[in-house]
Structures are given as structure tokens and as C-alpha cells.
Amino acid sequence: YRKDGGTKKLYLAGKIRSDAIETLLGECQKETDGVCYQGYLETEEKYRMYAACSAFLFPSRAEGFGMPVIEALTYRKPVLVSDLPIFHEIAGDAVRYCKLDTEDAVPQLAAAMRQIEEDGKESIPESLCEAVVGRYKKERLAGGLKEFLETIGKK
């Protein structure tokens, strides 16, 4: 991405469960000024990063639900995720997808990053973000749970 003219820095966050990968990230940080490994972020810092970022990338190979995607959309950020069924289910057309199981996954990811940079924040209609985020608001989920429990209690 940066070799092809991309100007944004890549901030990596989260707990790495592999010493080898963590070592590799440390080496990568030393060799390029464009990669910054943040490690695990506390909630306040995580939300500050969402607010400050120009886009959110989530190239996960396996994902249970994908709450970080919903959180990034809450901040109306362009989101790029791996092409997994769970992301289609929760985010639909509000995010961009990238296949990670191909030989050219890295160039595809870099091209998608460049496209997001070119398009800017306008790359995703606000109405799509609002629709996705609205489905997962605490109030709505709590109401659905209450209704479910009341239905079970009547039987």
C-alpha cells in the first residue's frame, strides 16, 4: 500500500497470541514509519482510535461475531473486512470485502486500502451505517431479549 503511494499509517491493535508474529511486528515497526503496533487497547483508547482513524481494516480469517466492525461503523468510518459470511450477515453493503484465501490477497488488500483512501469518508452512505448500527444498539437488543423472555415465560 505505502509502496504504491498510499499515505496513511497502519495502526495495528489487539492482543497477539503468537510470539513470532509479535516479534515480526516489532521488526516491521523499526523498518518502516508506516506501521505502528499498539497492542491491546483499553476501551477508552480503542474508541479514541476509532474516532481518529480514516478507515478501519479487519482482515480476520475467522470471526465469531465482529463487534469491532459495528463499533467502527458507529464512528461512520469506511470499513474493509475479510470476505466471511458473518460480516455479510452483520454489515451487508455497509462495508467493503476482500478475499484473503487467494494468492494475491495482499495486493488486493492494498488496492482496497488505496481505493478507500481515494474515496474518503464518503465511500459508504451514512444511511447504510445507521441501518447496521441501529440493529445492534443496546436498547433494541434489550427489547428483543425482554420480548423473547416474556414469550418463553407465557408457555
What do these predicted regions represent?
Residues 122-152:
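A charged, aromatic-enriched C-terminal amphipathic alpha-helix characteristic of glycosyltransferases
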Residues 14, 22-47:
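Nucleotide-activated donor-binding/catalytic signature segment of Leloir-type glycosyltransferases, i.e.
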Residues 69, 74, 78-81:
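Short hydrophobic beta-strand element within catalytic cores of glycosyltransferases
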Residues 61:
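Aromatic "clamp/platform" in nucleotide-sugar-dependent glycosyltransferases that forms part
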Residues 1-7, 28:
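Short hydrophobic signal-anchor/transmembrane segments that target glycosyltransferases
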Residues 48-53:
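Short alpha-helical donor nucleotide-sugar binding micro-motif in glycosyltransferases
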